[in-house]
């Protein structure tokens, strides 16, 4: 099992380089991804041990902030967030290896994107370790274009259908349901794919699906960035982007499993919260004007079948 974990780690670290390099090619000022390698001290008082590399870009003309973060951590006991639905795992040691990214563009017409790909192994030090993959990618537009959402979902469907034709409808629905702000009765964006506890096939089959899915992120996102990054925008557009970013913050801090897992397990706080946008605003009881561009967003981000 250690060999398989290391193989996935090698894939993720190469993917990290591929993604950061591809995004930098669209940046028009001197902003670059900065590498921040870290290691948790292997001491008895540390709940979580391991290492990682958080790559951050800030202050770009295209990407106001972005993070592409790799980590490999292990602990003696899974935190409550990881065992809430799987009580049989309570008390087991674990290894978690993953890559998580969030890209916050400066231009309000370029959507925010998020992706995550990970493997968990519970009881890795036993004769019968339990493994599963999780991940996916989702898109959060501020001023949406239907063709962008169609392209995003078509890319997701193509990669799913290559492995299992039941995956896309199942993982799309899961994504819609997961990225939902219950307290606002709002969806975060136009969705994409979300899956967890993936071990329905052999390890190699699941591995191949997850790596194909991860490699397709750039195919899904880069054409949208290229198409929208030079659209002119006003302060009104920027203000609405900042307001909607507030919803992103609310979701990450209240509902996101990765954030909760990281904080509960004693993870590296600076890396866990690096996905937060550089700026966000909240307005008391604000409502968009009827018929405005801003009002249309709320109709657009409801779940729908994007591929006719």
UniProtKB/Swiss-Prot annotation:
This is Oxygen-dependent coproporphyrinogen-III oxidase. Its main location: cytoplasm. Pathway: Porphyrin-containing compound metabolism; protoporphyrin-IX biosynthesis; protoporphyrinogen-IX from coproporphyrinogen-III (O2 route): step 1/1. Homodimer. NCBIfam families: PRK05330.1. A divalent metal cation binds at residues 104, 114, 153, 183. GO terms for biological process: protoporphyrinogen IX biosynthetic process. It is found in: Cytoplasm. Involved in the heme biosynthesis. Catalyzes the aerobic oxidative decarboxylation of propionate groups of rings A and B of coproporphyrinogen-III to yield the vinyl groups in protoporphyrinogen-IX. Belongs to the aerobic coproporphyrinogen-III oxidase family. Its EC number is 1.3.3.3. Substrate binds at residues 100, 116-118, 266-268. The active site is at 114 (proton donor). The lineage of its organism: Bacteria, Pseudomonadati, Pseudomonadota, Gammaproteobacteria, Thiotrichales. GO terms for molecular function: coproporphyrinogen oxidase activity; metal ion binding; protein homodimerization activity. The record marks 183 as: Important for dimerization. Keywords: Cytoplasm, Heme biosynthesis, Metal-binding, Oxidoreductase, Porphyrin biosynthesis. It comes from the Bacteria. PANTHER family: COPROPORPHYRINOGEN III OXIDASE, MITOCHONDRIAL, OXYGEN-DEPENDENT COPROPORPHYRINOGEN-III OXIDASE, MITOCHONDRIAL. The gene is hemF. Residues 248-283 are annotated as: Important for dimerization.
């Amino acid at each position: 099992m250690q060999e398989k974990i290391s193989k996935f780690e090698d894939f993720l670290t190469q993917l990290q380089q591929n993604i950061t390099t591809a995004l930098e090619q669209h940046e028009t000022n001197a902003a670059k991804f900065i590498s921040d390698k870290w290691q948790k001290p292997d001491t008895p008082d540390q709940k979580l041990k391991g290492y990682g590399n958080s790559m951050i870009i800030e202050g770009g003309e295209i990407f106001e902030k972005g993070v592409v973060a790799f980590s490999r951590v292990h602990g003696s006991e899974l935190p409550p967030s990881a065992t809430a639905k799987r009580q049989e795992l309570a008390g087991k040691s674990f290894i978690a290896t993953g890559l998580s990214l969030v890209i916050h563009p400066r231009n309000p017409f370029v959507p925010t994107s998020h992706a995550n790909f990970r493997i968990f192994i519970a009881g890795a030090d036993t004769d019968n370790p339990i493994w599963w993959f999780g991940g996916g990618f989702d898109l959060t537009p501020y001023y949406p274009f239907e063709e962008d959402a169609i392209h995003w979902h078509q890319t997701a469907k193509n990669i799913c259908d290559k492995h299992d034709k039941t995956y896309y409808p199942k993982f799309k629905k899961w994504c819609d349901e997961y990225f939902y702000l219950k307290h606002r009765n709002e969806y975060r964006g136009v969705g994409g794919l979300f899956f967890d506890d993936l071990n329905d096939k052999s390890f190699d089959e699941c591995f191949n699906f997850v790596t194909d899915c991860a490699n397709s992120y750039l195919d899904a996102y880069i054409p949208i960035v290229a198409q929208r990054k030079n659209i002119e925008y006003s302060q009104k557009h920027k203000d609405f982007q900042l307001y909607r970013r507030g919803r992103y913050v609310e979701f990450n801090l209240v509902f996101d499993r990765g954030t909760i897992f990281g904080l509960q397990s004693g993870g590296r706080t600076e890396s866990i919260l690096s996905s937060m946008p550089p700026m966000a605003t909240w307005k008391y009881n604000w409502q968009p004007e009827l018929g405005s561009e801003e009002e249309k967003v709320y109709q657009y981000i409801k779940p729908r079948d994007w591929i006719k």
